[in-house]
């Protein structure tokens, strides 16, 4: 097991608690190139983050508007017990409060997708982010977490039980939201059933969970919790603590909109592969996480996407007489494209677009300075 002395020299570990300043390794330029506005809707303006209530008979229409205009929305009435969400947040806080030497037992190795460490996309950037993360697959939850708790004691069993309960609730919710998305595209109940019977999207969707801890920062104007990006999969549920920090990018004029921390609500982000599946009618959203001087922040991303071998292409029901804007790709193929995009500054969605002149392919995938 790594000792504290060894950790101080390990480039994979940074002691945020001991930091009295933001070192150059964690200082990001260009963070304030665009203004930041409040997304709570207090003034009733155009920057109010859309809210979808799944109990509302008109929820599909609300999803359609939000997915077309924002690529994200706050989800209420989802049915996941609030006391479970509180237990999930407490479990995450407890995990990140473990001694560094214990967390480093589960450090993510090069090429691995699961484990403890910096955000997975951090390898594409020269600067470090002001956060710690832990990624695991719900399908392999207990084996993944044995790296953190090799003795499988009480803390391990409690954490696994909470996350397994959360996964069951979220997987059921994902199926309901997928159906709502398809209805929002204009599909009838029969068409939704036919799509599922033919393509088995809901049946085969895979899930990944990524836990985030954003420590309070001595100089938040120079640091960034998570770099601006889009999610690669179908869609993501984000559970965040009552400390705001998630921001969505909006055009016309360019600005960052801070998502309000609403008790009991989740954030839903549309991903790149869902933009492809819907032929650009629903679009993915650039988002980032910022830090603050006074409070730690916790979030959990529950990512949904297709199995690795499945080709994702625009649904014919989404074409509505228009040509397909994107070629078919598997998730691993698309991740390879994203890797090239990160290193060249290009747009991954444009790289898989059939025609770069197609409005759907170019809706929101221009890169931004952040």
From Swiss-Prot:
Q: What is the enzyme's class at the highest EC level?
A: oxidoreductase
Q: Which Gene3D superfamilies match?
A: B-lactam Antibiotic, Isopenicillin N Synthase, Chain
A molecular function (GO) term: gibberellin 3-beta-dioxygenase activity
Keywords assigned: Dioxygenase, Iron, Metal-binding, Oxidoreductase
Q: Which cofactor does it need?
A: L-ascorbate; Fe cation
Keyword presence, S-adenosyl-L-methionine: no
Report the catalytic activity: gibberellin A20 + 2-oxoglutarate + O2 = gibberellin A1 + succinate + CO2
Positions of Fe cation binding = 229, 231, 287
Q: What is its EC number?
A: 1.14.11.15
Which GO BP terms, alphabetically?
gibberellin biosynthetic process; response to light stimulus
- Give the active-site positions: 297
SUPFAM superfamilies on file: Clavaminate synthase-like
Ranges for the Fe2OG dioxygenase domain?
A: 205-306
Q: Which family does it belong to?
A: Belongs to the iron/ascorbate-dependent oxidoreductase family. GA3OX subfamily.
What function does this protein fulfil?
Converts the inactive gibberellin precursors GA9 and GA20 in the bioactives gibberellins GA4 and GA1.
Name recorded for this polypeptide:
Gibberellin 3-beta-dioxygenase 2-2
What species is given as this protein's source?
Triticum aestivum
Name the gene for this chain: GA3ox2-2
